Structures are given as structure tokens and as C-alpha cells.
Amino acid sequence: MKPGEYDIQPGEIILNEGRARLTITVENSGDRPIQVGSHYHFYETNPALVFDREKTRGYRLNIAAGTAVRFEPGQDREVELVEVSGNKIIYGFRGEIMGEL
């Protein structure tokens, strides 16, 4: 194997299989673009993003690791979220949870 080479098995890879999902509409009410990364706790995103925050507690974007979604100013966009896995303990981000969900 060479540095940077991938060894991907044949077949389909299903991300986040069997995990709870949620589809919501999000509006960027701000005057600047907002980008949200794949593992950011969606509940704690920029306050200029308008959506039912309480519904998103314990969820993140259902996109490939290392990628992000960009919300342009004034844009409404539908996104799919997936439940955070593991121990469901959240630290950091905007500091709104800092512990168990």
C-alpha cells in the first residue's frame, strides 16, 4: 500500500445505518454565510440559523465525516440530521450543553 492510497472493499457503504434521523428546514436569517461541519451538535449552531432547536438536541448533520453544509444569507434549506451516537455526552461547541444530553 502507498501513502494516501485507499483500500475500499467492493459494495455499498451505508453511513449511520439504524440511527434515528430527522429532517428539518433551516433558514439563515443573518447577512453572512454560515457553514456547519459534519459532527457539530446542530442544536448549538449559530443563532442566526432559524429552526426548531429543541427538536435537534442530540443530532448532527447526516453527511460524510469531514464535510460541511453552507447556508447562504436569506436561504431556506432542508437538511437531514442523525442522532449523535456513543455515550451522548457533549462538551464544547457553544457551551450550551456541557455534559449528558
Curated annotation (Swiss-Prot):
Q: Which InterPro entries match?
A: Urease_beta-like, Urease_betasu_sf, Urease_subunit
Q: Which UniProt keywords apply?
A: Cytoplasm, Hydrolase
Q: What is its EC number?
A: 3.5.1.5
Kindly name one Pfam family recorded for this protein: Urease_beta
List where the protein spans the membrane.
none
Single biological process term from Gene Ontology: urea catabolic process
Q: What is its main location?
A: cytoplasm
Compartments, record wording: Cytoplasm
Q: In which pathway does it act?
A: Nitrogen metabolism; urea degradation; CO(2) and NH(3) from urea (urease route): step 1/1
| Claim: Hydrolase is one of the keywords in the record | yes
Q: What does it catalyze?
A: urea + 2 H2O + H(+) = hydrogencarbonate + 2 NH4(+)
Q: Which GO terms describe its molecular function?
A: urease activity
What CDD domains would the database entry show?
Urease_beta
**Cellular component terms, GO, for this chain's entry?**
urease complex
Quaternary structure note: Heterotrimer of UreA (gamma), UreB (beta) and UreC (alpha) subunits. Three heterotrimers associate to form the active enzyme.
Concerning HAMAP family, the annotation shows: Urease_beta
The similarity comment for this entry is:
Belongs to the urease beta subunit family.
Q: What is this protein called?
A: Urease subunit beta
Taxonomic lineage is:
Bacteria, Pseudomonadati, Pseudomonadota, Gammaproteobacteria, Cellvibrionales
